[in-house]
Amino acid sequence: MSFKKLTRPNYASVTALVSATTAALLIVSGVTLPDVTHAQSPDASDWGFYGGDAFGQHFSSLDQIKRENVGQLTVAWTYRTGELGEGFERNSKLTFEATPVLAFGLLYLETATNIVIALDPETGIQKWRYDPKIDRKRHYSDVAGRGVSVWEDTDPKRQGACARRVFVGTLDARLIALDAGSGQPCADFGTTGQVDLTGNVRIRDRDDYEVTSPPAIVGDTVVVGSSVGDNRAVDVERGVIRAFDARTGTQRWSFDPIPDNSAHPAAAEWNLSQATTTGAANSWGVMSVDEEHGYVLIPTGSASPDFYGGKRLGSNRFANSLLAIDAANGKLVWNQQLVHHDLWDFDLAAQPALVDIELQGIPVPAVIQATKTGMLYVFDRVKGQPLFPITEKPVPRSTVPGEEASPTQPFSSIPSLVSQRKLNPDDAWGVTFWDRGKCRELIASHRNEGIFTPPDTRGSILSPSYIGGINWGGIAIDESRQRIFAAVNHLPMVVTLISPETLEQQAKSDDYPHSDFARQSGTPYAVRREPLLSPWGLPCTAPPWGTLVSVDLRRNRIVWQVPLGSTESIGPWFAPTRNFGTPHMGGPIATAGDLVFVGAAMDSYFRAFDLETGRELWKYRLPAGGQATPMTYRAGPEHRQYVVIAAGGHGTLGTQRGDYVVAFALPKGAKTVPSGVN
């Protein structure tokens, strides 16, 4: 594996009591948490949602495994899915990103090809398996599936088969309901257990319209977004968000982030004649649910295409936004746009994280949105006001004809987790004087004015870039400590707008061995992308290239940041094998055992860190890349705690391919330290 594999980065991808004055006080005096608010992991033995709970906190109250004994962790069981992409046209893009969920006594997961599997949580023995039989010859934009969602019918008259259901979205845009006990399709849902999501959506290319994340469930309503292929054209599929009856599959409502008439609430911030032919602004990541208020919190991505906006002038409101939608009727409650007129592929990829904060003695329901820019934004999740001030700051202007970059962007007052400053030639890094010199030349030859430097015909350095910052792995939160944990990328990319006439010539040329090309049909420019690498294939910027970071919201500061990943098996043979941190995909979880677990890095290690200090306490070399977010649960008569991660590799990162699900636990009979004893 090498950094050069990153040349195909297609990541398609709150109360009225809080006034601006109160928000300002928050920064001065800090915030405190009530002793008891939302219960993190209501049933400590379950991880019943992709994010642990409906709030997406990626936190477990289990503490059998803790910093005092985590070094004893051993493999409890390993399951192999058998899915390695045989016969798949886009085999090179196959990524096993699933986070299992535990419900109804079984562990449920999906493969990259949407095969749903139920396992015994104690042994890893397969209980059932369902294959939706997607067409493997199609050229899907992404080949990934992050997980499934589960639902239980509370109607006492409907307690037979399919009273408990598993919902999964597919690469060919179906929403499928399965009986949780048997894996059989629920015949009363849609047509023979499935709903075709391509209905009532403009489809330009069926291979560009997918579902890659688990749906959100609010009561008996299933809410689903979509993944839309990046950069092929302006008029790609629109990012319509839809809701379906969990029992029948009947559509209840839809919400289109892009206006198609002047009555649309975002119409004033688009060129309306252009908006009707624009696509995307879709929600391809994981949504979160505020069950008390009946809201679904939805992160959206860029309108199409990513790197040229001359055909979608305006701020493109509702794209690159956090939306709060009433799940009962599909009405927008509030929205906050975190990138105006996106030209960088800065989709909101991370799952929103819902927490309860106490301000001036008043509990405030909040939501935290992590971003690819490395900024964290916190809002009152009922009304939408910022709880930490946001300032509109001037950013570099575009010099590309026809483009109108936004003159300002919203900057959070929470410390950024990535550098926002201009990259200078003196910042070049290398293993030798020679490659550092080459990196100096590369940096000097491209446009870079810091964060939000627009794409340019001479090539612009994007730092942070479209892989993050924080990507779909999101954040973990220890609500009692009010601490955030995030895996953060620090790898600049170069984006160059090129003439469509030279696209084929450049794509075939040996002059661009590390580049990825996209047509952006309907615009004057195609696009070329590549990591900012030295001739040796290592980044031109100093390490760390990936970090694990802890943020204290009470004090509004970064507590610690440590490299995530080593250069073991990466780069040229003479490169130092050090804990330099690597680019990664996947996110962390935190536990009451004072631990943060994370895989994600390119070296295929699964790691545990001390939550308080960031010290690495344990690591295990997985049999394949662990580019997924782990989960944990308690099972069996001994109430044994397990930590599970999918290890199947990542096509874009080029990590080792595999089909493993690996569960770790303390050895049976191992001494466990009682909670609270150090």
Predicted regions located by residue number:
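Bacterial N-terminal signal peptides
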Residues: 15-32
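Short aromatic-glycine motifs in intrinsically disordered, low-complexity regions
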Residues: 57-65, 173-180, 236, 314, ...
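Long, low-complexity segments enriched in small/aliphatic residues
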Residues: 409, 413-491, 500-503, 547-550
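Repeat-blade elements of multi-bladed beta-propeller folds
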Residues: 47-51, 92-113, 140-174, 207-233, ...
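Mature N-terminal segment immediately following signal peptide/propeptide cleavage
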Residues: 40-84, 99-102, 549
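Extracytoplasmic/lumenal domain signature
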Residues: 71-84, 116-138, 152-157, 175-206, ...
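N-terminal secretory signal peptides that target proteins for export/translocation
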Residues: 1-14
